[in-house]
């Protein structure tokens, strides 16, 4: 038997996506995580990749739709992605779009040892990558950064 909240969320997401020329590829609902997690994968019709802007715009629309529906009466985490959207952040636009998102940074230190740090993307300037690690801003020189990858806060 299907969960009625999941069924309603799928209908809301599909209708919201269709209005923007998108379709929902997959919707996952995890009521056991704190906060509740809703993961939605979208793509353009017919089966074309979406841009980061498409994901951001859909996130705003579906968030508002869920709030108005009153289906979920407690805090929740909404994750929007695409089956074809890469996890690596590379362009200035990527870094602006995903400000505040969880990331993992692979970088080298002064001894050329590879290290990783995880936190929330704060900013990428001309000189540094700034990440928020438990409320503290950590600066990593941009020339030391090897990769910056989006991660899921749900593991």
UniProtKB/Swiss-Prot annotation:
GO biological process, one term: translation
Top-level taxon in the UniProt lineage: Bacteria
Keywords: Cytoplasm, Ribosome biogenesis
Record InterPro entries: Ribosome_maturation_RimP, RimP_C_sf, RimP_N, RimP_N_sf
GO CC terms: cytosol
Pfam family, one: RimP_N
Keyword Amino-acid biosynthesis: no
Location(s) in or outside the cell: Cytoplasm
Main location (coarse class): cytoplasm
Function of the protein: Required for maturation of 30S ribosomal subunits.
Similarity comment: Belongs to the RimP family.
UniProt protein name: Ribosome maturation factor RimP
């Amino acid at each position: 038997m299907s969960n009625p909240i999941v069924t309603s969320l799928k209908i809301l997401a599909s209708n919201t996506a269709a209005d923007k020329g998108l379709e929902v590829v997959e919707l996952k609902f995890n009521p056991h995580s704190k906060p509740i997690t809703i993961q939605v994968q979208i793509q353009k019709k017919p089966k074309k990749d979406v841009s980061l802007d498409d994901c951001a715009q859909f996130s705003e629309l579906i968030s508002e739709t869920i709030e108005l529906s009153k289906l979920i009466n407690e805090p929740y985490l909404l994750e929007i992605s695409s089956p074809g959207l890469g996890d690596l952040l590379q362009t200035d636009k990527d870094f602006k779009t995903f400000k505040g998102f969880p990331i993992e940074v692979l970088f080298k230190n002064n001894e050329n040892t590879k290290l990783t740090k995880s936190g929330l993307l704060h900013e990428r300037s001309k000189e540094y990558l700034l990440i928020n690690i438990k409320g503290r801003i950590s600066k990593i020189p941009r020339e030391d950064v090897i990769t910056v990858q989006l991660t899921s806060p749900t593991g």
